[in-house]
Structure formats: C-alpha cells, structure tokens
Amino acid sequence: MLLLLLGIIVLHVAVLVLLFVATIVSQWIVGNGHATDLWQNCSTTSGNVQHCLSSSANEWLQSVQATMILSIIFSVLSLFLFFCQLFTLTKGGRFYITGIFQILAGLCVMSAASIYTVRHPEWHLDSAYSYGFAYILAWVAFPLALLSGVVYVILRKRE
C-alpha cells in the first residue's frame, strides 16, 4: 500500500511539474530565432540579444492563459485534498473529490492546448515554425492528469 501511495504522489507531482513548466517556459512556438509562449513573444538578434514583447491581448490567448492557470490550481488543490482525505477519510472510502479535481485539471490543460492549436492555423503551413517543448509538455500532462484522476476515483483507503 505504501508503494501505491508513493507512486500516486510521484505521478501527481510529475503532472504538477509538467503543468508549471508548460505554463511558464517561452517555448510554445519556436522557429527563425523566435519563441512564443502564453505570456510573451521573444526574438533573438544576430548578437544573441533577446528582445521580448508582451503577447497580444486576444480573447483566445487569454482563455488559454486562464485555463492553464486553472489546471495548475485544480491540480494543487487536488494534491492538498488527497493529503487531507488520506488522514480524515474512513476505511473503505474513495477519493472522489481528489479525483474530480485532478480530472478537471486534465480537462483544462486539454482545452488550453486545443484552443492554442486551433487558433494558429497559419503556423501549420509555414515550415519555419514548429511547436516547442512546452506545448508538447502540456499535451503530455493531459493524459497523465486524467490517469491520475481516474486512479484517485478508483482508489480505496485501507488501514
């Protein structure tokens, strides 16, 4: 049982790290000395000087920002609730609330990555730009968060 709890906590912390990195790092779109993320657009000049400007104030970008932040909040709340339920839940009880919040975190990150993908159709045609590692980490966090949430829902507390 101790190994199961340790595995679940490691999976949850891994999801949290992926969500934080995907939200913070400026590597959602890369190419030709440019890097774009949710918060700023950066370009590197020939002298290796990096110039960054704030991202546009488009509604779709603000919705991506909000859903990524919500996914982090839901995941942190889920981890906190897991530890609370671990000590207060009766024997045989299930971690429903923890699982629901973790599934919500997964759905939020999926929504954010989907909106970001749909709103950039012009970059699909230009081979000079590609999706960066932070964008890929967001997509990797989605199934891991869902898996973690399902495990929480199925999990029963033992003595």
UniProtKB/Swiss-Prot annotation:
> According to the UniProt entry, where is the signal peptide?
none
Q: How is it modified after translation?
A: Ubiquitinated by the DCX(DCAF13) E3 ubiquitin ligase complex, leading to its degradation.
- Keywords from the UniProt entry: Cell cycle, Cell membrane, Glycoprotein, Growth arrest, Membrane, Transmembrane, Transmembrane helix, Ubl conjugation
Q: Which residues are glycosylated?
A: N41
Residue ranges, Cytoplasmic compartment?
A: 1, 92-95, 157-159
Location (main, coarse): membrane
Can you list the GO cellular component terms from the UniProt entry? plasma membrane
Q: How does it sit in the membrane?
A: Multi-pass membrane protein
Q: Tell me the residue ranges located in the Extracellular compartment per UniProt.
A: 32-64, 120-133
Membrane-spanning parts = 2-31, 65-91, 96-119, 134-156
Q: What is this protein called?
A: Peripheral myelin protein 22
User: From what superkingdom does this record's organism come?
Assistant: Eukaryota
